[in-house]
Amino acid sequence: MVETQMDKLGFLLNHIGKQVTTKVLSNAHITQTMKEIILENHSVDGGAAKNASKGKSSPKEKKHWTEFESWEQLSKSKRSFKEYWTERNEIVNTLLLNWDNVRAAIKKFLDDDREWCGRINMVNGVPEIVEIIPSPYRAGENIYFGSEAMMPAEIYSRVANKPAMFVFHTHPNLGSCCGGMPSICDISTTLRYLLMGWTAGHLIISSNQVGMLTVDKRIIVDLWANENPRWLMAQKILDIFMMLTSRRSLVNPWTLRDLKKILQDYGIEYIIFPSNDFFIYEDARLLMFSKKWTNFFTLHELLDDLETIETKATSST
């Protein structure tokens, strides 16, 4: 039987779907404590709020939420997780943050030949970097889907699995593919944590701007109110992945406005700091480099990389 491009595409999308679902299910440490706190004051009959009010935190629980080693540990502490959840929602509701300190601290890393990632917490009301680690790969090494630089999932997970108000990674000054536009892989990986309620946002920091992916609390509440929230998370992430991939294959040049509109349809915001005037600059840059732009890969590019994907899928089974 002759294998058509649609057959190959079907295999590819099925493989991607399995990968997304598996990662969401394995990373989603859902505890009753987390569910009660997230759904508190949001259930129709008040059941979640009533249940949440029954338990009392142990008097020994004096750790601030930033002192826990993992989200899984934090999720078991009612007092500390509620403290985090309250702070998180206050920040997402306002987002009146000054990123000057962060941008100044990151500036020297943007000239490096690799990406960096790390965590940011609020210190005296100001965002401050509390951890930063480099990618083991320099530009051009172990590159997947034609990107110029990458942060491997195991390194990102090591950082993102620790409690923090924000997680970030850099897009260094390496060329047309390393501007402020998040890749589809950036988005799908980030959403695994944001939809769990972990962190207020994920930052993509480049030389010209700080871009933040964030999720409204109502989206998280709707997911957690379901009997099986992890499956809904996996489905939502896969839906967004497929929509972005298909739209990117039809729209050229692909701009930040296109990205922002699609994400908003799913309740996801991509916010630019210091201001949305950056869209003007970024759109002009993408027009200039439209033929070289591969940070968002198209369906055609996905098919070209199918042999690599098949090899990776076979070797991992």
From Swiss-Prot:
Reported induction: Expressed in the late phase of the viral replicative cycle.
Q: Where in the cell is it found?
A: Virion
Q: Name one GO cellular component term.
A: virion component
Keyword entries, A-Z: Late protein, Virion
What family does the Swiss-Prot or TrEMBL record give for this protein? Belongs to the asfivirus F317L family.
| Name under which the protein is recorded | Uncharacterized protein F317L
